Amino acid sequence: MKVFILALLALTATTAIAQLETTCSQGFGQYQQQQQPGQRQLLEQMKPCVAFLQQQCRPLRMPFLQTQVEQLSSCQIVQHQCCQQLAQIPERIRCHAIHSVVEAIMQQQSQQQWQERQQQAQHKSMRMLLENLSLMCNIYVPVQCQQQQQMGQQQQQQQLQEQLTPCATFLQHQCSPVTVPFPQIPVDQPTSCQNVQHQCCRQLSQIPEQFRCQAIHNVAEAIRQQQPQQQWQGMYQPQQPAQHESIRMSLQALRSMCNIYIPVQCPAPTAYNIPMVATCTSGAC
């Protein structure tokens, strides 16, 4: 009888401990979710900031107010909502929230408008955005936000450039036909150029369409840096039609070679006079 009572007490204690651990785990999980809002939740919170920064608000017309008084406008209301939401976001994730706002604005703008902006202009826009929010809301925004944005863009460009290394190799004529002494029967032999061309097209197809222009420009920049300095001195002059023609021809070569969609407005941001090859035919580049 005593053994049965002791066993019953032990079972009751074990069940209580298990329930307590489960409750604590669930509570801690809910606490983590509350402390670390996701991307969608942050974007929902920052919607007033997106509307304000896009200048989608307009002053309210109140013709019935004849006296010269400061009239509330929809812009002022949205601005107040933006600052209120930003103040409620913890300091450690304000950078992430601001980056979400910038990304949302970029996605809503036309693709061509954003592709025609240089990297320095984007850095300047990010810096001005941070300064404006800090002054407008009289709230602390970490200084390293801009540094994180620059590092993120540099890492993205480096990753795109590494993905398209086969394209740079192919476009620079650095591939050569493979020597195959056998068989003696004349057949279409695979060449290193064709292999590199296949790798180039495969990598380019894996890059999302909205990033292909930037990726191709990164390839052009990599080729330019590898060429002798004297060859490239004074050649970056976007106003020269010949250089626009060169980058246009290179884009056409990649389009036809890979049979892949590349936005037509790609030539706008940069223009490099780079020797290009359209395709590998008959075992030669």
Swiss-Prot record:
Gene3D superfamilies (alphabetical)? Plant lipid-transfer and hydrophobic proteins (1.10.110.10)
Pfam families recorded: Gliadin
KW Signal (keyword) present: yes
Signal peptide location? 1-18
Question: GO: which molecular function terms?
Answer: nutrient reservoir activity
How does it get modified post-translation?
Answer: Contains disulfide bonds.
Q: Which UniProt keywords apply?
A: Disulfide bond, Seed storage protein, Signal, Storage protein
* Reported function: Seed storage protein. Might be integrated via inter-chain disulfide bonds within the glutenin polymer.
Task: Spell out the family assignment given in the record's similarity comment.
Answer: Belongs to the prolamin family.
This chain belongs to the protein called: Avenin-like b1
